């Protein structure tokens, strides 16, 4: 018997399924890309505008300080765009974009503490000081945030055939963000929020947006996220708790009230670091600042005794002189043209201002509001809208002076409180401009607390009548210039016109 053979059959082996590949990086959707550059560019412009107000208490608000801030921020934007593009080509642009957004927010949160720390030392040191504080406080955040646009573009550019469309779209959204940031800050945020609060909100928004974007793109590790959150909390608290020098942060000023030493019921109104007004809450006849005493004496000369006066005040401040006029010349009517609504509200809430027929605030730019004043309606016009750092140039020109003449009665008085130092080029220019409109122009250089008349408040008096001024004894010590001396003093002064009024360059600041 033949034994049968069993043929072994091959055993089939099934291979185990291959592990799934790790998920690839999450693509940056065009809408997210557009929103990111919109936010970053808008934040830069918002911080730039807010920096002007944030720095004003320390370096003033002039054309030159504003130019320094704008120029420094533009340099930061250019630097950030250039360096950001280089790093976007050399590193993971997703992680870079997230890091830049978080870092930009953290640097924005540092803006207020840096300004509060460096600002006091910059006061009185001119435009280089303004530039230095800006470089330290604002340029880092502007540069970091400006590096985001080229990084986003690097992420979006996958098809060179569509590169023009992509770059154009991102540029459009970045510009739109800048526009929204600009208009939103000027028209909404500054009137609504204190400047320091607005900067805090911007910084928190940027940093939180960076964290959310990092989670969405899976581009931030747990340790980095925890560190970012700690930074947000720490810097947010630092920014929020840093003392503000302002009792009221208005659209135009950092306003502060101080008790006047030696007076039970008197306050100083301090605007952007300058002592603007002395207000006695119980006795409006008490006017302590020498320049107000000089102007009051000039008004008394025009309206002797207690004769009522129809007056237009250009600039309200603490409303010291309008209230003095109502108390010393019963029946007087004062229109007070004040651009700063919040300052008027501060006067009403904290300084006892009660608007009435005798003292009527008119909120708006005086150059516009003056057009509503009837011709030949005012005995006096008082120009008191100038400080050592803030010069509304449109209220110094020949065209403005023509408007003042229209409002004045024949023989009426136009008195200006101007501040100048050094060579007095600004005072000479304004006197020369007044002499083109009025027959009798005189100058009073008011002494400072130490009796020095080499700079500070200067009272310019202009009228068509051959007026001889009489002054109270407590206003003595000033340098007075009669008509002939004033003409010699201002003989080479620049005529200020609407199309040529370089007042910021003519003004000389102490220690500037």
Segments and roles (model prediction):
Residues 220-278, 284-288, 298-302, 442-512:
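Soluble small-group transferase modules, centered on the S-adenosyl donor enzyme superfamily
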Residues 367-371:
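Short loop/turn elements that flank and shape the SAM/SAH-binding pocket of Class I
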Residues 389-403, 426:
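A short, conserved alpha-helix within the catalytic core of class I
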Residues 2-248, 259, 263, 273-276, ...:
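Alpha-helical transmembrane segments of multi-pass membrane proteins
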Residues 306-317:
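Conserved class I S-adenosyl-L-methionine
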Residues 344-345:
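Short alpha-helix immediately C-terminal to the canonical SAM-binding loop
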Residues 281-285, 388-391, 416-422:
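Second-shell loop/turn segments in exported
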């Amino acid at each position: 018997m033949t034994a049968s053979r069993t043929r072994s059959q091959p055993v089939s082996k099934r291979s185990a399924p291959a592990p799934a590949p790790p998920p690839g990086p999450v693509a940056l959707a065009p809408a997210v890309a557009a929103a990111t550059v919109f936010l970053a560019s808008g934040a830069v412009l918002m911080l730039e505008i807010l920096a002007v107000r944030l720095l004003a208490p320390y370096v003033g608000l002039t054309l030159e300080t504003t130019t320094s801030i704008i120029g420094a921020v533009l340099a930061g934007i250019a630097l950030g765009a250039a360096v950001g593009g280089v790093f976007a080509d050399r590193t993971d642009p997703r992680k870079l974009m997230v890091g830049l957004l978080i870092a930009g927010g953290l640097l924005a949160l540092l803006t207020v503490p840096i300004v509060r720390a460096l600002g006091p030392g910059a006061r009185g040191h001119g435009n280089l000081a303004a530039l230095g504080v800006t470089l330290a406080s604002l340029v880092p955040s502007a540069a970091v945030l400006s590096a985001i646009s080229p990084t986003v573009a690097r992420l979006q550019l996958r098809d060179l055939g569509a590169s023009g469309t992509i770059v154009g779209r991102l540029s459009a959204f970045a510009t739109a963000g800048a526009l929204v940031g600009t208009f939103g800050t000027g028209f909404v945020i500054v009137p609504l929020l204190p400047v320091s609060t607005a900067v805090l909100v911007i910084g928190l928004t940027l940093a939180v947006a960076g964290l959310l974007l990092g989670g969405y793109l899976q581009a931030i590790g747990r340790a980095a996220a925890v560190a970012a959150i700690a930074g947000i909390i720490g810097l947010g608290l630092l920014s929020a708790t840093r003392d503000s020098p302002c009792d009221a942060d208005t659209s135009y000023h950092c306003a502060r009230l101080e008790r006047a030493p030696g007076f039970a019921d008197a306050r100083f109104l301090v605007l952007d670091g300058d002592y603007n007004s002395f207000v006695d809450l119980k006795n409006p006849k008490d006017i302590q600042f020498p320049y107000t005493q000089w102007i009051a004496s000039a008004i008394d000369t025009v309206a002797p005794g207690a004769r009522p006066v129809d007056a237009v005040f250009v600039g309200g401040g603490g409303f010291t002189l309008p209230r003095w006029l109502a108390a010393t010349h019963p029946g007087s009517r004062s229109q007070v043209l004040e651009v700063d609504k919040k300052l008027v509200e501060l006067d009403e809430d904290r300084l006892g201002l009660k608007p009435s027929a005798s003292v009527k605030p008119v909120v708006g730019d005086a150059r516009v509001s003056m057009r509503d004043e009837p011709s030949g309606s005012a005995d006096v016009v008082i120009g008191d809208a100038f400080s050592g750092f803030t010069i509304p140039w449109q209220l110094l020109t020949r065209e403005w002076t023509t408007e003042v003449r229209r409002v004045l009665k024949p023989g009426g008085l136009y008195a200006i409180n101007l501040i100048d130092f050094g060579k007095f080029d600004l005072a000479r220019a304004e006197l020369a401009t007044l002499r083109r409109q009025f027959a009798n122009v005189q100058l009073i250089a008011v002494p400072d607390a130490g009796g020095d008349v080499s700079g500070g408040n200067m009272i310019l008096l202009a009228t068509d009548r051959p007026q001889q001024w009489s002054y109270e004894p407590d206003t003595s010590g000033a340098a007075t210039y009669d008509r002939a001396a004033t003409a010699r003093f201002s003989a080479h002064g620049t005529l200020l016109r609407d199309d040529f009024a370089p007042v910021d360059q003519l003004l000389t600041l102490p220690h500037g």
